[in-house]
Amino acid sequence: MLPKGVLLFLVLIVLVQHFATVQTTNAIERPSAPSSQCTSSHESCVLRVMCEVEPRARTTLVPCLTADGLEGVCCSVAKEGKQRKKRSLPFELSQELFQNAVGEGHRVYTRKLANIDHHREVMRGGSVDTLVRQFHAPPGEPLGAEDPTAYEDMFVARSFANALNLSVAERLDLPELTLDPALRRKRCLPPRSCDPHARYRSLDGSCNNPVPARSSWGAAGYPFERLLPPAYEDGVWAPRVHSSVSGRLLASARDISVAVFPDVDRRDRKFNLLLMQFGQFMSHDFTRSASVRIGQEEVQCCNAEHSGALRGEQAHFACMPIAVSPADPFYSRFGIRCLNFVRLALARDGKCRLGYGKQLNRVTHFIDGSAVYGSNEALAASLRTFEGGRLRSSFPTGEELLPFARTRAACEPWAKACFRAGDDRVNQIVSLTEMHTLFLREHNRVATALAALNRHWDDERLYQETRRIVGAVMQKIFYNEYLPSIVGHSKARQYGLLDSHGEQTDFYSPDVKPAVFNELSGAAFRFGHSTVDGAFLIQHRHRRTELVPIQEVFLNPSRLLQRSFFDDFLFSLMDQPQQQLDDSITFGLTRLLFAGRNPFGSDLASLNIQRGRDHALRPYNDYRSWAGLERLTSFEQFGPVGARLASVYEFPDDVDLWVGGLLEPPTQDGALFGETFAAIISEQFARLKFGDRYYYTNGPRTNPGFFTGEQLRELSKVSLASVICANLDQADGFSAPRDAFRQPSEHNPPVPCQTLVGMDLSAWRGH
């Protein structure tokens, strides 16, 4: 027993299974016609996302129809009060041992910080690395302070595990700790004070789930979650860099990029570039990671000449540079042997768990318009006019554009324009800036209409009601137009992603954690990089068609200053095919990413592969198993690309998730990609829908800011095409296809904008 006088803190050991059941489900296989009843008395028919099963289990869930007529699965119902089994400790933990581990971890971390200060290496202004880092975190934006406690905890966890000689598997199940109040404030995400009846979402996403212990779920600053346990090589934070079969180093991410992803022009037969661009815009609404920094300075992992990596004491503990072969077909021309790569910032754990690293998401996990409005009060306020509920904008040519940035740090020095929005990546590429401009205009259009309908509403009411409507518009388009286009209508129905138009629902579950998966952020939702074209074909109505290489419009949205460019570019995005999703990626991304006026840039494919290893995502085969597919045991099973894979991977079990997912043949029901990515993406957005109390269709039993039946019927009329037509500078004479993501064709002909009627805002009169 501990002496009664020892009051520093109390350590309560509770070994828990690796993932809470609200976070994990397993893949299922479905027959085409689900039955309406479950045969077992211990099962009930629920939506798939509501069913809790073990992540490592190979379970086949029987399909059925829910009481609402939706496709569900027969799921075992746990008996009330039944507790999950807890494994006993194979050792006894003394307070002294734990204190020693904390002390040793603190000493190691302190030495690391002192070493960093002594060997401080920062990026040089204008270098490719600086531009690449702007891709992850442009300076000067209120993203929230990085928490050094999260990194110290990694060294504490390693010290603790080493002292107990724990295996890697045991380290993934490190105990939860109940600490004294002072340590809890230091190591845990703070609880939020919530009003369960608040009509509007919080800007930072907190209190969506008003249960005190869950009030941070999905909020900005909450970590990414996982479908499967991480593959950290030390069970704590060491990235996945060795073969799980041979133990030898995995091939360089750049070598894999060169071998597997050439630049081949294969245009998609159905979808246009607007699908690609809307996907990136929406991804910024629910994912925002940033690399580790030294205070406000960037971390450099390569030497000044990029001829090699920094070594020994000169290397930051978060460095993970990408090696470049001396025989590289492109970088060898410039003597480049090292691409800078810094690991992602970590978050504190909401449960004070002393365990493996969890990556930080700086924006809300919800689809809530945070890319338009921001994820914190300071940023949101800076974007408002505080008059009539409108957002700030600029009119340099008489046409409404985003407000200009206060500094040019996030753009090329020679850019004539640099904008700001709710997300600081707004200037990454001009087509992304176009999407931000569209939804800025939509906000101000709706706010102006509401002000005319409800003259008694003040600025705050107009702003919040408009934000609520625009968030609903984004959800409606995302779930009913975008997701069916990428995962297929069958998969969208299977996971309950499609909405019942004009009807209130009550699907919210406080037990579904609305958190973005590492697997989505680090791999699956990066599928769109394969669909990027190397150039925009901009069809101007009043001048000659223009072919613009994408590297000319990275961090340079100046073309928006041209009169009528906004309208012309939207027409062009709807008309130009996206690239086919396959084993090809444009050199604009794999050689010239953010090159500026340099002859070379970085390689996004390499960054994606390295990011997956930083996240410690498990190999592709593990996710095939999770999705109900057979593991691939030979490279021949990958098809024609198998020989190229075999040239850079030792074993099929080594193939990275992003690589394998891109190469998987599309499903038969119209998805862009194969079953693995389709399952991950569908599972993800089912969680974000059914775990969102404020989802736009949820009625008064669930959502204190619910829409009336009349308002939902108007929202059901909204389409991306109608939003585009409502916000053009010259809608007369402009035609758009009703399905804005599909190329114009005889089955999807362009129709005059006057026929694309959206919602009638008079449904909001007096409400």
UniProtKB/Swiss-Prot annotation:
N-acetylcysteine, modified sites: 188
PANTHER family per the UniProt record, alphabetical: CHORION PEROXIDASE, OXIDASE/PEROXIDASE
Alphabetic keyword roster: Acetylation, Cleavage on pair of basic residues, Disulfide bond, Glycoprotein, Heme, Hydrogen peroxide, Hydroxylation, Iron, Metal-binding, Oxidoreductase, Peroxidase, Secreted, Signal
Catalytic activity field: 2 a phenolic donor + H2O2 = 2 a phenolic radical donor + 2 H2O
Assembly and oligomerization: Heterodimer.
Cellular compartment(s): Secreted
Post-translational modification: N-glycosylated on Trp by mannose.
Enzyme class label: oxidoreductase
Sites annotated Transition state stabilizer: 425
Protein name: Chorion peroxidase
UniProt EC number: 1.11.1.7
One GO molecular-function entry: heme binding
List of catalytic residues: 284 (proton acceptor)
Modified positions (3',4'-dihydroxyphenylalanine) in chain numbering: 331
Positions of glycan attachment: 165, 237, 457, 658, 764
GO cellular component, one term: extracellular region
Binding site for heme b: 529
Disulfide bonds: 194-207, 411-418, 725-753
Species: Anopheles gambiae (African malaria mosquito)
UniProt superkingdom: Eukaryota
Cofactor details (free text): Binds 1 heme b (iron(II)-protoporphyrin IX) group per heterodimer.
Pfam families for this protein: An_peroxidase (PF03098)
GO-annotated biological processes: hydrogen peroxide catabolic process; response to oxidative stress
Cofactor: heme b
